[in-house]
Amino acid sequence: MDITKHLKPNLVDPNIEESIIKKLKPPVEDYWAPTKSGLHKFYHNFIRPNIYLIIFIIIVLLLLYYRYRRVKADKEKEKLEDTDKEFDKSTNNDTNSKKIYHRQKNSKTLNSSKKQSIDDTELLLQLYNLNKENLREPPITKSNFAYPMYPYHKGGTLISPGSR
């Protein structure tokens, strides 16, 4: 049996070894130190002395934004009222849109204290879509009209001219 241990000889005194490690060990650097110090300087030089001015400016901006939203809502309401008046004056023969409009108008008068079930913009969107559908295709004058028609073929039949 081999009882010999492989021991390393201690050639350097432990005190000297500690001093060497302290000298050779690189210092721990904080990666974000320049950023932290820069933000710290910016805060102390600019923000801290003017904090009340900054708060005042933020409050003024919030008030201006609130006023802008109110004025915009009032203008939209006026436009909506103008379109309602124009719609009443117009002689539109579209019965579907009139039914929807008058049904909504009557529900407004009956439930004036309640919140509207259908928003005015949604109503205008419905009217727009109905008018768009009606304008998409002209009224049909022929009774036996079917798609696809070949208008350049004699008689306008459903069969393509090249298939005969």
Swiss-Prot record:
Localisation: Membrane
Positions with biased composition (Basic and acidic residues): 76-91
Keyword Transmembrane helix recorded: yes
Residue ranges crossing the lipid bilayer per the database entry: 46-66
Signal peptide: none
Residues covered by region (Disordered): 76-114
Keyword vocabulary terms for this entry: Coiled coil, Membrane, Transmembrane, Transmembrane helix
Coiled-coil segments: 72-137
Top-level taxonomic group: Viruses
Membrane topology recorded in Swiss-Prot or TrEMBL: Single-pass membrane protein
Main localization (coarse): membrane
Record's GO cellular component terms: membrane
Protein name: Uncharacterized protein L310
Protein species of origin: Acanthamoeba polyphaga mimivirus
Taxonomic lineage from the root: Viruses, Varidnaviria, Bamfordvirae, Nucleocytoviricota, Megaviricetes
